[in-house]
Design a protein with these regions (language model features):
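Mobile, glycine-rich extracellular loop/lid and propeptide segments
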Residues: 1-11, 58, 63-64, 72, ...
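A post-motif C-terminal structural segment
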Residues: 4-10, 14-56, 102-290
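Short secondary-structure transition/capping motifs
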Residues: 47, 70-74
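Glycine/charged-rich beta-loop-alpha catalytic/anionic-binding loops adjacent to active sites
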Residues: 65-67, 235
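Short, contiguous strand/loop micro-motifs
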Residues: 67-69, 199
Length: 290
């Protein structure tokens, strides 16, 4: 969950407890996990990280400078866990509720000294060879100035089937790797929130996870990075209730992963984490301990 610190988790749990007529409690599926750990998120050059450096730390196991994607502070490419496992025969899926070329998902397949090199990062989807990508769209899909060939066309010309929305996904070419994009993200720089009038044609992250699992199949082991990216976006915008709803939406994906775990307990590992906390969220005191 991008930007999902302990404050955000506690708030979502508290909201769900209130809805259930309870005081306190662990309502989110991942709040009930048996193990909990905390970490420092400072980057190689700043006390306050950004998603690029933090995503790279998660993906590659090495701290780097803010704005760096999949490279060390000197700009040397790093190898992410996704590449390591792909080389070992795992199928790989990378998915998010924000643009697929945004910082955190990009850290698992991209290499760029600037997180804002969206166009070039998008083209690295092809280089990765990963079997499934999902997101709300592509930032700068025709380049920063809008004067380059559309990146989705480039991706399709180089071996992938780009599917806009569930209908195109169902009609996909099953012999090709897949990039799933929300219908509302067609030919635009996307921005969408679950509780802010999301398009009916769009799917939540749990449904995207289902799509990814369907593509990756069960004949080979697989690795999935599934990000609730809008948690961070809502927190940046000071939309507290939207932040809560995004966490609840993300938790539905965790619940689906748990169902898979229950079917394959000896070969499944689920890790829920955050690249950083966003917004310094604090649960306040109204004078009546509410």
């Amino acid at each position: 969950g991008d930007g999902m610190g302990m404050g955000q988790v506690t708030l979502a749990d508290s909201y769900l407890s209130y809805k259930a007529g309870e005081l306190g409690g662990e309502q989110l599926a991942f709040s009930k996990f048996p193990y909990l750990a905390l970490c420092n998120t400072y980057s190689a050059n700043r006390n306050i990280t950004c998603s690029a450096a933090a995503g790279t730390a998660i993906a590659c196991g090495e701290k780097t400078n803010n704005e760096h994607i999949g490279v060390n502070p000197e700009g040397k490419p790093l190898e992410s866990i996704a590449y390591v496992l792909h080389d070992k025969g795992y199928n790989v899926g990378i998915m998010t509720t924000v643009p697929v070329n945004h910082a955190t998902p990009a850290a698992f397949y991209g290499h760029n000294s600037s997180r804002y090199g969206y166009y070039d990062i998008s083209r690295e989807i092809v280089d990765s060879g990963f079997e499934f990508f999902g997101g709300s769209g592509f930032y700068n899909y025709k380049g920063r100035e809008g004067d380059k060939p559309a990146v989705d066309i480039y991706i399709e010309e180089n071996g992938y089937d780009v599917c806009y929305g569930p209908k195109e996904f169902k009609a996909r070419d099953k012999d090709r790797n897949i990039v799933f994009i929300q219908e509302s993200g067609r030919e635009t720089d996307p921005e969408n929130y679950v509780s802010d009038g999301a398009e009916e044609c769009d799917v939540e992250i749990a449904e995207m996870l289902e799509m990814g699992m369907e593509v990756l199949g069960d004949d080979e082991p697989f690795f999935i990075m599934c990000e609730g990216g809008n948690i961070d976006w809502a927190a940046h915008d000071n939309k507290t209730m939207t932040t809560v709803m995004e966490i609840i939406s993300f938790d539905k994906a965790v619940q689906r992963a748990l169902e898979f775990y229950e079917e394959h307990p000896d070969e499944t590992l689920i890790v829920v984490t955050a690249d950083h906390e966003t917004g310094g969220l604090v649960l306040g005191y109204s004078g009546e301990y509410k």
